[in-house]
Amino acid sequence: MLRTQAARLICNSRVITAKRTFALATRAAAYSRPAARFVKPMITTRGLKQINFGGTVETVYERADWPREKLLDYFKNDTFALIGYGSQGYGQGLNLRDNGLNVIIGVRKDGASWKAAIEDGWVPGKNLFTVEDAIKRGSYVMNLLSDAAQSETWPAIKPLLTKGKTLYFSHGFSPVFKDLTHVEPPKDLDVILVAPKGSGRTVRSLFKEGRGINSSYAVWNDVTGKAHEKAQALAVAIGSGYVYQTTFEREVNSDLYGERGCLMGGIHGMFLAQYDVLRENGHSPSEAFNETVEEATQSLYPLIGKYGMDYMYDACSTTARRGALDWYPIFKNALKPVFQDLYESTKNGTETKRSLEFNSQPDYREKLEKELDTIRNMEIWKVGKEVRKLRPENQ
């Protein structure tokens, strides 16, 4: 009888495996098919494209709406004064330059950012200036300083924003929380925002690969009646693949919320909790790290990024699928109150106040280094360094 049951299980397993293999092959073909069959016609059609995102129709803009020749003509009389050369300044500045637009950098002379800009080919007196000189020369002033630095430098920058210029942000932080930052944009200028959904390094690397990062855009002031098209065009010019409309308020709330949640803080907390429980139950550091971080980042997350979470439920084993289906509602119900508190904390300005207070302290770098050193010395991340060394490509 046991042999008969075992034979049935094996047979059923083979049938399920065969069906799942066929389903995955069909699914994979479905995911890859649009790239070959539908993208090109969409690129060659109208500028406005409406996409149904899970039942909500939104208008998106793509590179096809602003090809390079159109960008060069639209911005032919403009100079982009990019203030700050940190993560976003680096990525957006180099992409603008590679797209053939007239961009200059404004930073503190002889400071670290000045030296970094020179290493990237920016030339003092030609396209590298002090902040004041750059703003005076620019028709677009792209304020890409850190949030704390924007607040500190605003009294010096605001008088330089003369009529006719366009003020640009990549984060809604400063103008939205103006009661805390004291950054109140002039009412007689177009004020726009383009917020890449990733770091400046990613903005640059995806552009160099011929791809593009997703970005949102928003308009604070539309004095000329052209603020929307300015933002859409500039979003493409800095290297966006597609861009969608939001507001300054929604951008800053979703950005702060995401960074503290699934993008950084929340995922780090989940990694630590799972790792700790495994270690407390006798699992080795290597096993705990592999089951918590390595498998997630090297195997599962790339597939989720490429095909979606629904694909993963088809792609995993029957045992993994059953467990995930049973447990994801439990995690959702446990975590949702935390996320609700987090969103309220971003919306009411608590996170902004905390950020400004900490990042404006004269010894904030020393305090930050202590916090980062604590993370570096956590067992989980020490183990991670050793595990990464064992990857074949690192040997």
Curated annotation (Swiss-Prot):
Any one of the GO CC terms: mitochondrial nucleoid
Location within or outside the cell: Mitochondrion
Principal cellular location given in the protein's record: mitochondrion
Keywords, comma-separated and alphabetical: Amino-acid biosynthesis, Branched-chain amino acid biosynthesis, Magnesium, Metal-binding, Mitochondrion, NADP, Oxidoreductase, Phosphoprotein, Transit peptide
Residues that, per the record, bind Mg(2+) 2: D255, E291, E295
A Pfam family that the UniProt record links to this protein: KARI_N
Reactions mediated catalytically: (2R)-2,3-dihydroxy-3-methylbutanoate + NADP(+) = (2S)-2-acetolactate + NADPH + H(+); (2R,3R)-2,3-dihydroxy-3-methylpentanoate + NADP(+) = (S)-2-ethyl-2-hydroxy-3-oxobutanoate + NADPH + H(+)
Annotated binding of NADP(+), by residue: 84-93, 108-113, 146-150
Transit peptide location: 1-47
EC number: 1.1.1.86
UniProt-annotated stretches for the region Hydrophilic: 363-395
Domain annotation KARI N-terminal Rossmann: ranges: 57-246
One GO biological process term: branched-chain amino acid biosynthetic process
InterPro entries recorded: 6-PGluconate_DH-like_C_sf, 6PGD_dom2, KARI, KARI_C, KARI_N, KetolA_reductoisomerase_fun, NAD(P)-bd_dom_sf
Binding site for Mg(2+) 1: D255, E259
SUPFAM superfamilies: 6-phosphogluconate dehydrogenase C-terminal domain-like, NAD(P)-binding Rossmann-fold domains
Pathway: Amino-acid biosynthesis; L-isoleucine biosynthesis; L-isoleucine from 2-oxobutanoate: step 2/4; Amino-acid biosynthesis; L-valine biosynthesis; L-valine from pyruvate: step 2/4
Cofactor field: Mg(2+)
Residues bearing PTM Phosphoserine: S355
UniProt record similarity statement: Belongs to the ketol-acid reductoisomerase family.
Miscellaneous comment text of the record: Present with 883000 molecules/cell in log phase SD medium.
Job description of the protein: Involved in the biosynthesis of branched-chain amino acids (BCAA). Catalyzes the second common step in the parallel biosynthesis of isoleucine and valine. Converts alpha-aceto-alpha-hydroxybutyrate (AHB) to alpha,beta-dihydroxy-beta-methylvalerate (DHMV) and alpha-acetolactate (AL) to alpha,beta-dihydroxy-isovalerate (DHV) in isoleucine and valine biosynthesis, respectively.
Protein name: Ketol-acid reductoisomerase, mitochondrial
